[in-house]
Amino acid sequence: MHMTVEEMLRSSEVQTAENGLVYAVVESEGTDATAVPRMVEAVPRSLAGRVGRTACYFVPWLLKEGRGIIISGEDATPAEEDGQKALCHHLDVRPQGSLLIISLKFYENDGYGLAMEFFDKIAYVASLAEEQRDDFYRLLERQMRDERSGELTPEAAEWRREVIEQRGRGEAAEESLTNYHRAAETDALGVYMAALFTDVFFEDLFDDEESTPPILPEQFYDRVRTLERLYPANRGYSLQVVRQRPRRSSSSR
C-alpha cells in the first residue's frame, strides 16, 4: 500500500480528541497504534487551542521520494537508488492549519522516542502562537542572568548567546530574543507534555557529545512547573519527571 499525502487526507478517518486535537491513524498489518489515543489526549486542553487547526496523522511508514513524500504500509527498505528515504516525521506549518505526519514503524519498539517526537512538534507549533506567555518569558530572563545556566538544546543555547552578545554591544535584540523564547519554550513544553504521558528522566535529555552546557536541574524544574501552571494537566494525567534513573544496589547484582 502506497499513497500520497493528498490520498491519505481524503481516505483517513479523522477523530477529535477530548482536548480538541484532531488526529488520525493510518493502520496496516503489524502496526501498533494502541498508545496513540492516550498520547494525543495528554496535550493539555488549554494548550491545544494554541496549535490551531493542526491535524496529526500517524502512519506506518513515511518515505521521502524526490521532492515529495509518500505513505507506505509495507515493511520495505527504502529504495535509495530511486531517491527514497525513511522519515520519522513531516511537519507542514501553514496559517490555515498545520499538518503533522509521524511514522509509527520508524519508532517501532520505541514508545519513548515516539512520544518525544510527537510532543516536540506540537510544542513547536504552539510556540508560533502570537499571544504572550509573560510568566515563562520573565523566568527565562531571570535564568539568563545566571552565568551557570545552560539550555536543553544547542539551538536554544545559540539564540540565548546571541541575545546576550547583542545586548552587550548595546544593539536591539528583538529578533534573537523572539527566536530564543521560541526555542526554549519548544524544548521545555515538549518535555513537559512528554512527562505527562510517560516517565521522563532528566539525565536522558542530554547527549554526552553535546558541547553546550546542560540546563541546571533546578532551572529545568522551574520551567516545567511554570508551564504546568500555565497549562494544567488534563484529568487522568500527572507530571512524571525524575532527576536520576534508579541505580541497582550492589547487593542486588
Regions of interest found by a model, annotated:
Residues 1-16, 172-253:
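Pan-zinc metallopeptidase signature
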Residues 52-61, 132-133, 153-159, 241:
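Short glycine-rich, low-complexity/disordered patches
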Residues 100, 108-120, 125, 179, ...:
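Active-site alpha-helix of zinc metalloproteases
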